[in-house]
Amino acid sequence: MPPANTQAPPRSTRFFLLACLLGLSLGAPAHAGRHRELLVDGPVQVDVIVDGSGPALVLLPSSQRDSEDFDDLAQRLAQSGFKVLRPQPRGMGNSRGPMEGLDLVVLARDVALTVDRLGNGPALLVGHAFGHWVARVADMNHPQQVRAVVLLGAAARSFPPGVAQALAVASDPSQPEADRLTGLQFAFFAPGNDARPWLQGWHPELRAVYRKAGATPPKEQWFGVSNAPVLDLQGADDPWRPASTRNELKDVLGDKVTVQVIAKASHAMVPEQPEAITRAIVQWVRGLIP
């Protein structure tokens, strides 16, 4: 009989082994209740909301919005067997750090810190809209911390006309409520879905700093790069991602990308179809298991 192998499996293998448990834990109660951790690294502190236990999954929010947008989705994913980590972007919640020179590289470093301190190996990164830029750069710069990447509501490489203007109105509390709702319904919510909850939750005071942060590094440096497999979840009614651009990323990265369209969802997606998103992520992770 050969001697027992006492060497621990690599972290990517451990992720796979833990992911196998998802088939048993789907719908089961999360093993750990919701709580917060404050990670400190020199002048930086990252406020992280934690749900559940299991392989690490990091949720990254959209432009000018914070991680509390994911409350419902985080609970569903935790109940499906993940340890869900939600680092608040700098300037939101209790997350702090230098804002001068903030860019996607710095934001990705905060994600890597979260995975290093609270993960149990490389994590699944789930980025919503602007958050998917952070996830992509984290995968590029910190591949050892990233097992896979899920894109929620990733816009087309070049924004279609009108959507950025609608965002500017919808996110501005000084604008008339009727105009904001019109912008939300046009650019974020599918027909029949209630846009009113998103009148709240914006951080317009951070608009300029995050707009500047999103420009560095330029998209050309990271759009065609992926160390990890990618699930590109698109809303069927998302004006930021016209049907003609469905395979835009897959055409560049090939078989690393799986494209799936979520019905009755637009750019907001997360509050519109949390159950469909959860199901898609869990099924895709199962498919990654060798």
What are these regions (language model features)?
Residues 256-290:
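Catalytic active-site module of serine/aspartate enzymes centered on a nucleophile-bearing elbow/loop
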Residues 49-94:
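Conserved HGGG/HGGXW glycine-rich cap/lid loop of the alpha/beta-hydrolase fold
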Residues 161, 171-226:
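Conserved alpha/beta-hydrolase catalytic His-Asp/Glu region
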Residues 226, 232-234:
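Short beta-strand/loop motif that positions the catalytic acidic residue
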